[in-house]
């Protein structure tokens, strides 16, 4: 039997969420849609813990509806955004403190809900977004990986550029999402070819770790999602377009049609 108590943790602008919710409605399932960015306005979250042997209780309030989260069968964690605050009276320091408190609370709450079926657990998603760990897992399962150097040392970057004869790409070490201070604007750091003139930007390189990789010529891309034991994969002919040749996420769908494999 399909799970009946489903919580979807997302953001209001996510079109994938809306499509899945509509499909669940057709199945006779009424999921609970939760946008964490609304905390502090008409959403609240409370955790009840005590010395008694009874299990912890997590109560989510959306508008005036109270939802016992321990009764959830399944949770879909789909790109929620950070909490935003309607009050303009908070200082920058106070806002940062409040966001850190929410982050600590949410991370703890999700771990406490380990009895649910997750797609996917936030702690696993965070690890999966880290390039060094991605490469380690790829190597462990037998995949070939390109030569990689992650550093904030400008000299190391220059040496790696020479080692790869100038065939180097640069990418984010983490997820690559960049949010504006008010959370209204979202940008994404894509993969780019490293130019020799970029290596003179010592101050910029020192600010944060950068992932440098040897560029490997490719015929096409494979995008795969695994749900349970099922692998859903598509082939993307990214090399058919100059727009998507370095990073397929510079979409040119008209000239690079996707096919299932």
Residue ranges of each PLM-predicted region?
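Conserved hydrophobic helix-helix packing surfaces used for dimerization/oligomerization
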Residues: 5-7, 168
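Cofactor-binding loop segments of dinucleotide-utilizing enzymes, especially the Rossmann-like FAD-
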Residues: 10-11, 36, 229, 236
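Phosphate-binding site of ATP-dependent enzymes
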Residues: 24, 157, 162-260
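General beta-strand structural signal in soluble alpha/beta enzymes
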Residues: 33-34, 118-120, 147-151, 170, ...
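Short, basic, helix/turn surface patches
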Residues: 56-69, 149-150, 169-183
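Short acidic/polar capping segments at secondary-structure boundaries
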Residues: 82, 123-126, 150-156, 174-176, ...
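Rossmann-like NAD(P)H-binding beta-loop-alpha module
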Residues: 141, 146-165
């Amino acid at each position: 039997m399909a799970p009946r108590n489903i919580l979807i943790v997302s953001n209001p602008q996510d079109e994938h969420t809306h499509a899945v919710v509509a499909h669940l409605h057709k199945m006779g399932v009424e999921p609970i849609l939760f946008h964490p960015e609304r905390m502090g306005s008409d959403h609240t979250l409370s955790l009840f813990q005590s010395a008694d042997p009874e299990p912890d209780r997590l109560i989510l309030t959306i508008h005036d509806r109270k939802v016992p989260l321990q009764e959830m069968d399944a949770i879909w964690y789909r790109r929620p955004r950070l909490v935003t605050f309607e009050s303009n009276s908070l200082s920058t320091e106070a806002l940062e403190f409040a966001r850190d408190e929410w982050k600590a609370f949410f991370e703890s709450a999700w771990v406490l809900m380990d009895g649910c079926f997750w797609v996917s657990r936030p702690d696993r998603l965070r690890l999966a977004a880290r390039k060094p760990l991605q490469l380690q897992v790829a190597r462990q399962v037998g995949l070939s990986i390109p030569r990689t150097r992650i550093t904030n040392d400008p000299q190391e970057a220059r040496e790696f550029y020479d080692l790869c004869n100038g065939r180097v790409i640069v990418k984010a070490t983490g997820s690559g999402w960049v949010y504006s201070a008010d959370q209204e604007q979202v940008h994404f750091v894509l993969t780019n070819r490293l130019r020799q003139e970029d290596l003179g930007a010592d101050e910029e390189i020192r600010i944060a770790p950068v992932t440098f990789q040897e560029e490997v010529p490719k015929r096409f891309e494979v995008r795969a999602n695994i749900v349970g034991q099922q692998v859903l994969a598509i082939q993307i002919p990214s090399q058919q377009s100059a727009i998507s040749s370095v990073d397929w996420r510079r979409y040119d769908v008209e000239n690079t049609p996707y096919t299932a494999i």
